[in-house]
Amino acid sequence: MRPDQWRVADFTYCWTLAGFCYTAFCVDVYSRRILGWRVMSSKTTPLVISVLEQALFTRRRTAFRFTATGLIHHSDAGSQYTSLAFTEALRDSGIAGSIGSVGDALDNALMESAIGLYKTELIDRHTTFSGRAELERETASWVHWYNTQRLHSAIGYRPPVEYEHLYHQQTISAEVA
């Protein structure tokens, strides 16, 4: 397995004093790195498309040789992920879509786990968020910490960014040898 082979995506709701907001994520399965995320006040297709676009941008700005061709994007069967606009966005990016079975949370277990960590480590620790802007600021801070400092047992107790860096170092060393 390698980075940019398989991604998972989903979103969750978060209560604020201004009403519900929805936070969506896109995670690289290999490294557990959150590549894209977004907070919006509605759970429409633009929410998940913007996360897909952010994940692509994250890779394109840091990986000279990045291509989305052959990448698999897995999500649940929610209407946002099965919409024509989203499937066209996947196709236009060269990404293969994968949809889980209806009502099976285990089908997207890695994403459910990441959302569980988000809820436990950020949302549940906050008494209340004033609105979308505060939730967005706090989420940005949490995502940075999650990607650069949080240790993950599944990847050798390393943060996702470090784990990806090790992969790329090993790949370069193998190419030189």
Where are these regions (language model features)?
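Charged DNA-binding/catalytic regions of mobile-element recombinases
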Residues: M1-A177
